[in-house]
């Protein structure tokens, strides 16, 4: 599950993926860490989109919902702390 490119919307786009992640207190850098170090993958029960789970360097256990554009490119839709996890 390695991708070469992650597509980000403009930071100030209120409907963009950067803002969707920020609403949950997750930064672009944290999302990129999870993509690089994904520990598990699944399908979101609510959206039907693929998700990856992983830890950040600060110890947060995150879930990233994404769309795979092609074999090398992903578009993160949103990200948040895994429910029930003990995050710093």
State what each model feature region is.
Residues 1-88:
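Ribonuclease/tRNase effector modules and their secretory precursors
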